[in-house]
Amino acid sequence: MKLHELKPAEGSRQVRNRVGRGTSSGNGKTAGRGQKGQKARGKVRLGFEGGQMPLFRRMPKRGFKNINRKEYAIVNLETLNKFEDGAEVTPALLVESGIIKDEKDGIKVLGNGTLNKQLTVKASKFSASAKEAIESKGGKAEVI
């Protein structure tokens, strides 16, 4: 067998069935949609239940989206160990080093893990445990 003699496996390459292209095609006229009726004509919207009150309208409304909500990028203490002892950690430095992807509405430092270095950390918010851990190592937690 040579390269120009290669053929696809039997039945692996089926021709697309084009519906509604004449009666002799086997799928003309009604194009596989049956006889008259709602489903033969147009489309029904997503979640349509045949005129019955749809599920999403039977359920009660709940909650709301607070337009003033602030979403903070989270940084834990254990990730701050990547920086050198005595370094000043800023939001720009965190983005540059790839610890966070986006600054969002600010940065919040949480106290997960242990901090082994003396750092000056500048962020929008600190949890109480994170602030305590940074200051116990001789560092500073500055709110910007």
From Swiss-Prot:
Residues 1-10 have a biased composition (Basic and acidic residues). The keyword DNA-binding does not apply. Residues 1-52 are annotated as: Disordered. GO terms for molecular function: rRNA binding; structural constituent of ribosome. Residues 23-35 have a biased composition (Gly residues). The keyword Ribonucleoprotein applies. Keywords: Ribonucleoprotein, Ribosomal protein, RNA-binding, rRNA-binding. Pfam families: Ribosomal_L27A. One of its GO terms (biological process) is translation. One of its GO terms (cellular component) is cytosolic large ribosomal subunit. InterPro entries: Ribosomal_uL15, Ribosomal_uL15/eL18, Ribosomal_uL15/eL18_sf, Ribosomal_uL15_bac-type, Ribosomal_uL15_CS. Part of the 50S ribosomal subunit. Belongs to the universal ribosomal protein uL15 family. PANTHER family: 50S RIBOSOMAL PROTEIN L15, LARGE RIBOSOMAL SUBUNIT PROTEIN UL15M. Binds to the 23S rRNA. This is Large ribosomal subunit protein uL15. It comes from Ligilactobacillus salivarius (strain UCC118) (Lactobacillus salivarius). The gene is rplO.
